[in-house]
Amino acid sequence: MSNVPAAVKNLIIINALVMVMTALNENFMYEKFALFYPTSPFFHWWQPLTHMFMHGGFWHLFFNMYTLWIFGSQLERVWGAKKFLLFYFVTGLGAALVHTGVEWLQMQNWLAEAADGSYAAQLSIHSLKMTPTVGASGAIYGVLMGYAMLYPDAVMALVFPPIAMKAKWFVLIFGAVELLTGLTETGGNIAHFAHLGGLIFGYLLMMYWRKSRTLYY
């Protein structure tokens, strides 16, 4: 990893170390550092930040860190470590904000149904409060947006399906898929709106930098 920029390298190392710590004491790590809904008994104020360093398994970690290495390294080379880290954490925290906001909307519907005596709604409320969210994926999607806006015509190759497309179309398609799967509640235990939030905050920050003429420094 000698050719990997410092900030990206340190992020990868920290994420890997947290994975090891989670394997050694999973219950403690999840209860303290995963992201819980604000009214959950397990919620702590630092979780919107710390959940970005936790992952649900080796492959979750691997694909996020691989994407960070490929695309984050290029952004850091252009921006420098400080600006890249600002972008990374703003998009990651923005992803957590969007994810929690969508959960809040779900909670309002369930609370109304529970007030009418719905047992299913009560179970949904309990499940939402007890279910943790982990992963750097929100920030990673922000990184993809940043790359696509800096290099819109760069060709990105998908592993599955094995096709190549320009970065601007890649990000647009991924965003549409995340929105569709989020709205239809398909795709398993994946925080689709967190991914979408990373894209949104990445776009907003890139537009702000573009208007302030600080996009490349």
Residue ranges and their predicted role:
Residues 1-217:
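A detector for small-residue-rich transmembrane helices and their helix-helix packing motifs
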